[in-house]
Amino acid sequence: MIGAGGYADNRWGAAASTGTGEVAIRTSTARSVILYMKMGLALPEALQEALRDLRDLRDPYAEYIALIGLDREGRHAGYTHRPNERYAYMTDAMTEPEEVKSIHISH
């Protein structure tokens, strides 16, 4: 479903979620990240706010969602309710992807 698991708008950036898709659909999680950036939040804050939206559902499966995002300048970030989550990224200047630890936010 567009806007829940993945969303992109070249004016602001892109976001994707992994985990329990039914929960991401309820809040259009990926689209929410982009909307928060449109409203003036930087990527890290937009990802955090989208995770707060999920937390406010009080759904036990919301803790399984992980978010990654990219702003229009190419800066990336990953946020999750679960400790020790990682994501990988690669730019056109790289020959191999790099794995990065996501930032953990308590659920």
Describe every region a protein language model picked out:
Residues 1-107:
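N-terminal nucleophile
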